[in-house]
């Protein structure tokens, strides 16, 4: 990897961070998509045939299991967002380097150093 240019190393770093972000985003999406299923399963566990749907919903949402699920969902979203910020910073760092190199080439051409 030592033969790679600075820009090549930057894009490789951005790609790795992008992959990590995608993995964390997928994890969060799975948790988020399962939210209604988790709530329904908790309501089914509490259903004795006598409680109303509204009461089952309230009891399920107030349960420790659902609170823990929501906490894990929030933690997954936070991790996903932090990974996204790191990826976007790495991508922008690459773009800044690419722009700087293009500017330097243009300056050399303008000054006549490059045929």
Question: Would you name each region that the model predicts?
Answer:
Residues 1-115:
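Charge-rich amphipathic alpha-helical interaction elements
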């Amino acid at each position: 990897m030592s033969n790679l240019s600075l820009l090549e190393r930057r894009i490789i770093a951005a790609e790795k961070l992008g992959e990590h972000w995608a993995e964390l985003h997928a994890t969060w999406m799975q948790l988020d998509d399962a939210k209604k299923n988790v709530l329904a399963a908790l309501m089914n566990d509490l259903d004795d045939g006598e409680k109303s749907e509204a009461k089952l919903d309230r009891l399920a949402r107030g349960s420790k299991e659902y609170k823990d699920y929501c906490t894990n969902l929030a933690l997954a979203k936070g991790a996903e967002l932090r990974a996204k910020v790191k990826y976007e910073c790495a991508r922008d760092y690459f773009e800044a380097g690419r722009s700087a190199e293009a500017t330097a080439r243009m300056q050399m051409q303008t000054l006549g150093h490059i045929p």
